[in-house]
Amino acid sequence: MDRFELRRLDYSLSDDHVALQNAYRQFFKTHCSIETVRAAEPSGFDKSLWERLCAMGATTMALPESCGGDGATLVDLTLVAEEIGRSLAPVPWIDHVCAARLLGRLGALDADTAGLANGEQLAALDARIDCVRGARLIPTGSIADHIIVRDGDQVVRLAFGTRPAKVDNIGRLPMAWVDPAAADSRTVIAEGSDALANYQRALDEWRLLTAAALVGLVEETMTIAAEFAKTRYTLGVPISTLQAISHPLANMAIAVQGGRNLARRAAWFLDNEPDERPELAPSAFVFMAEEAAKAATMAVHIQGGLGVSAEAAATAYLVRARGWPLAGGDPGATALRVAEIVAARENAPQPA
């Protein structure tokens, strides 16, 4: 892909991008069936799937070459995230790579965290926009070896001798309450404005990749609903020909394409011109957080009584469409951040 294509609103993928996405799509199709997803729900994590994913290089690709990684771009990472969402893969890849990339930027990938690059150790971060003190819900807190949080103007790495207990959550994530004061190990890895700016970058990347995952989720739930509608008849015609079915499906397709384009554009700017359009990554997240819930709900409605059964794949997609965005706190806080960025830019003094 030409370096400036996404800046020019050309969202086509190169042959390498297509090959990358196809490789991960085939991987999850082979190793992550809906039965695998269901089996992992008690813990929110499939260790075997994670090890297979790491063996493909999914964690090392996200790190720069200076940190022993493969130097993948954020556009590359959105393609992997999309396939994770499509398959509902019970792996903490998004949280892990965002935390590992943050540690890399802060020069904190040391001997204690040597296992992060290849996924032997797991990293988590507090994905909330607002900085809170005391205990907070961490999306992958029950399985992480290292938990990265803000504490005032410090970025700290926490470790627990006994991992925090998983709490039930609608997104079926390995979520846990984490109190920095209760950690067995607390290491300050950076402090000051630069440290907080780098943490904000990690939050933007988390929202970007979560948005991309929701794109894949919506596309798959749309496919499930469409296949159902093509095989069910009423009055001698497939229900897919009825406007009450076909129009919502078309709206899902529009949401998928719009969210995908927005995520890829946000990824390009975050990589190449991060100060030019900082609102794009949180905008992609806010858009997909809303659209994913609406699309997954409609997919359940299209399937009627079958769709609301606990065994239906559509139900698995619905709860995650609603739950995954909440892992970063109230999506409204992200919408407020978008508004603040745009307002600050519009109200900035213009050069004479």
Regions found by a protein language model. Give the residues of each.
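Alpha-helical interface subdomain recognition
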Residues: 1-87, 109, 201-352
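FAD-binding core of flavoproteins
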Residues: 88-94, 101-227, 352
